[in-house]
Structures are given as C-alpha cells and as structure tokens.
C-alpha cells in the first residue's frame, strides 16, 4: 500500500516509523510519503486566510492543497479528508480502506477548509464527536487501524480477526503467567486444555462484555443459535 499525507507538520508522524506500521514499511508492504503543502503556497507561503462573509478563525486556502495534490495524484486514489463533520470511523471502515492500493490523507489545521478543497475528496472521516487541533492525530489513528489489516503485516491473520469489533463483538478477557498474581487467579477453564469449553467461555465473555458495555453493537449483530442462547443466559443472570 502507498500512502501520501498532505500536512503542515510532517514531523508529527514520527510514531509511524515504529511498531507495526514501521515494520510494514521495513518489509516493503507499505510506503508513506509526507508532503508539506506550505511549500507549494503562493502569497509568501501563506496557507490560510480569513473567511468570506466574516467569522472566527482562519481557513486553509485551496491553492496550496490543489497544487500539492496535482503533483502526487497521477491516478484516482481514495482521498481522505479529516473532518469532524465526516462519517465516523470504525473497524468496518478500516477493513474497507485496507483493500486499497493507494490512499491520500489531507490533514487540516486552523478553523477549517475552503469548501472547494472537498472536490478532491472521496471520503470525509471523523473519529468522533470531538474537536482536535488538526487532522494529523486522526490520520495516524486511521492509518494504524488500517495498515495492521493488510495481509502479512501482522504474522497471523487470526491475531486481528479476534480483536474487538472484527467479529462484531468486544474481545474476551485474556491472561498470561503467572496463574495467580496479588490474589487474582486465571479462570480455571483456560488451564483445562478442553478446547470446546475454552471456546464457549470466550464466546460467553465476549457477549457479556458487549452487552454490558456496548449494547448498541448487538442491535444489528447476526446471532447464531448458540449465541442467542448464551445471551439469554447472560441476561437472566443480570436480572436475577
């Protein structure tokens, strides 16, 4: 996958040189290029200006971003604009982006964008109902969530398929050595060696955590008969 990032602050992306995303670049599975669109700004390198009609703050001008975009977008890639008014990002969105061969991220700053910039964009994405200083942190979050889903980036595909949200449910609790720590013990079923009992325990724990913490995820979840029975058991225990 190739990713191009239009930003005023390329240095903010240093964390992408480490961990999973950094290893993906080392393996040749990922290429990330940073483009400071201030370098293409006319008018003494000014990238922002006052909004027509008045108002608070400054807007990013169209010219620097268009000129930068023209230099890098030979094809018609997926172009992502980070915007609090965009579609909310989730695991399903990450899985969709991971199928792409090329992505371009436009990271804003200041009060907002000249609306004409959005004619370049295929996706407007938000992380949630809150405001960040700029689009850089949001872009890094989306890139991390997306890149780890690219085949061969993570050693075992099952490693991310078991993650929270990948199955539609929150992930079950996990434990490692020692068996007991400060009076807290690992559930005995996990030491039993009985694979079916372990599978059922994990499924029940995932359902329980999802029902208690994110019941909204269950509204459109496609239950198996086994899952329906387990959820009814969980609900009856909760009401007893």
From Swiss-Prot:
Under catalytic activity, the entry for this protein gives: guanosine(37) in tRNA + S-adenosyl-L-methionine = N(1)-methylguanosine(37) in tRNA + S-adenosyl-L-homocysteine + H(+)
> An example of a Gene Ontology BP annotation on this entry?
tRNA N1-guanine methylation
Q: Does the keyword ATP-binding apply?
A: no
Keywords on this record? Cytoplasm, Methyltransferase, S-adenosyl-L-methionine, Transferase, tRNA processing
Q: What class of enzyme is it?
A: transferase
| Gene3D superfamilies to which the protein is assigned, alphabetical | 3.40.1280.10, tRNA(m1g37)methyltransferase, domain 2
- A single Pfam family, by name? tRNA_m1G_MT
Where in the cell? Cytoplasm
> Listed GO molecular functions?
tRNA (guanine(37)-N1)-methyltransferase activity
GO CC annotations? cytosol
Disulfide bond residue pairs: none
Q: Which family does it belong to?
A: Belongs to the RNA methyltransferase TrmD family.
Function text: Specifically methylates guanosine-37 in various tRNAs.
Could you describe the subunit structure of this protein?
Homodimer.
Supply the name of the protein.
Answer: tRNA (guanine-N(1)-)-methyltransferase
What organism does the UniProt record list as the source?
Streptococcus mutans serotype c (strain ATCC 700610 / UA159)
């Amino acid at each position: 996958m190739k990713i191009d990032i239009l930003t005023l602050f390329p240095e903010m992306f240093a964390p992408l040189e480490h961990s999973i995303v950094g290893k993906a670049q080392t393996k040749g599975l990922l290429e990330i290029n940073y483009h400071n669109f201030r370098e293409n700004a006319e008018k003494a390198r000014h990238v922002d200006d006052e909004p027509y009609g008045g108002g608070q703050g400054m807007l990013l001008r169209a010219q620097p971003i268009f000129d930068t975009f023209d230099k890098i977008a030979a094809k018609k890639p997926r172009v992502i604009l980070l915007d609090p008014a965009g579609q909310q990002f989730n695991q399903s969105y990450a899985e969709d982006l991971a199928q792409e061969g090329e992505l371009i991220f436009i990271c804003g700053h200041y009060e907002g964008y000249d609306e004409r910039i959005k004619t370049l964009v295929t996706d407007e994405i938000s992380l949630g109902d809150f405001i960040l200083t700029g689009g850089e942190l949001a872009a890094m979050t989306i890139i991390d969530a997306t890149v780890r889903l690219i085949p061969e980036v993570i050693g075992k595909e099952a490693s991310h398929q078991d993650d929270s949200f990948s199955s539609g449910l929150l992930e079950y609790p996990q434990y490692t050595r020692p068996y007991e720590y400060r009076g807290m013990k690992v559930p005995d079923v996990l030491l039993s060696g009985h694979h079916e009992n372990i599978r059922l325990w994990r499924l029940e724990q995932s359902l329980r955590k999802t029902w208690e913490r994110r019941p909204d995820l269950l509204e459109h979840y496609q239950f198996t008969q086994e899952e329906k029975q387990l959820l009814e058991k969980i609900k009856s225990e909760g009401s007893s």
